[in-house]
Amino acid sequence: MAKTKPILNVAFIGHVDAGKSTTVGRLLLDGGAIDPQLIVRLRKEAEEKGKAGFEFAYVMDGLKEERERGVTIDVAHKKFPTAKYEVTIVDCPGHRDFIKNMITGASQADAAVLVVNVDDAKSGIQPQTREHVFLIRTLGVRQLAVAVNKMDTVNFSEADYNELKKMIGDQLLKMIGFNPEQINFVPVASLHGDNVFKKSERNPWYKGPTIAEVIDGFQPPEKPTNLPLRLPIQDVYTITGVGTVPVGRVETGIIKPGDKVVFEPAGAIGEIKTVEMHHEQLPSAEPGDNIGFNVRGVGKKDIKRGDVLGHTTNPPTVATDFTAQIVVLQHPSVLTDGYTPVFHTHTAQIACTFAEIQKKLNPATGEVLEENPDFLKAGDAAIVKLIPTKPMVIESVKEIPQLGRFAIRDMGMTVAAGMAIQVTAKNK
């Protein structure tokens, strides 16, 4: 079998009107991942609906409802090859009510491309753009590039490009902790393909890489095989003749037959008999592998979705309480001590109570603005002490970042996102 190229997960982020889906569609077409005939058909469909220019976006906006609204809702995954990688695109939704998807999407990303409209230099940075960049930073994405889109609308003006580059650098990236000097800003016209996959003939002043070349310059993630084993359970099946088969994705560490393991917070202990992926038995599985495995000594009723598997020598941490850094994204009123929304962390969904709001922070710099504030509102960042209403596994981001991040949901929306910075473990 030929060695496949390494996979790189790249999130495309930015405001809903910046042309993200069109940029992605163009990458897929010029990268040979979609049939040009499909674009011809979608162009016709777009024109009939009075949405000319949406044909590339339709590739990612696979859901019918999305096509009609012209809005990306779910996290869509598509692949295309570059010289170096097999790139999986995570096209993150742009609208506020879909931030939950954004969080689950971004946490799978190794790098991100922020798509901005060159016209933003006139209108200012959209709040949504800020939120997206802040979120990927909070979720641990450290590699970023910026696509300055719709350059054809300003006749590929170098002055307009430089104005936007300075604004994004000074007013957004520096404040959030990215160094603009180390970030590629690529002038593109995605609808026409300029500098997306192929170099543009229309802006001779730009000598830098295309979006595809920038993606090739990203570093592949190092698999966290040296961290303790953590595998959040997604589902548990009973297979005749085999027994109990939990399934999930290895987040950290390595799992292999013969391992003595424990599921927390269930407390069930067993031994791994077999590990399978795509119906093939594996000698071991590592981070990123979606596997099913058979455990001796553990029944279907003993464990459930949201439990986390680890080795008995280094079990997952069950928190009695934890301290977290959070950012409030949206809330109709204010958050105070005693507030108990649902926390989504790995595969678990557990209500946690705000025991104490300890500090309010500047969301851009992290400096303390106020000690022991009475409340938090949308846009605030804070350090808070939280108490789970029932046992849950969460790890400190300093130790196992993959299990330290969470989204907070309430009233059908994502009200906040954050990470655990200190965890008080339940005594075994």
Curated annotation (Swiss-Prot):
Region G2: start-end pairs: 70-74
Record's keyword annotation contains Protein biosynthesis: yes
Gene Ontology cellular component terms for the protein in this record: cytoplasm
Domain tr-type G span(s) in chain numbering: 5-225
Keyword Metal-binding: yes
Matches recorded under Pfam families: GTP-eEF1A_C, GTP_EFTU, GTP_EFTU_D2, GTP_EFTU_D4
Residue ranges, annotated region (G5): 189-191
Residues that, per the record, bind Mg(2+): S21
This protein's UniProt keywords: Cytoplasm, Elongation factor, GTP-binding, Hydrolase, Magnesium, Metal-binding, Nucleotide-binding, Protein biosynthesis
Region (G1): 14-21
SUPFAM superfamilies attached to this UniProt entry: EF-Tu/eEF-1alpha/eIF2-gamma C-terminal domain, P-loop containing nucleoside triphosphate hydrolases, Translation proteins
Molecular function terms from GO: GTP binding; GTPase activity; translation elongation factor activity
Enzyme Commission number(s) of this protein: 3.6.5.3
Function statement: GTP hydrolase that promotes the GTP-dependent binding of aminoacyl-tRNA to the A-site of ribosomes during protein biosynthesis.
Protein name per its UniProtKB record: Elongation factor 1-alpha
Species: Methanococcus vannielii
Gene coding for it: tuf
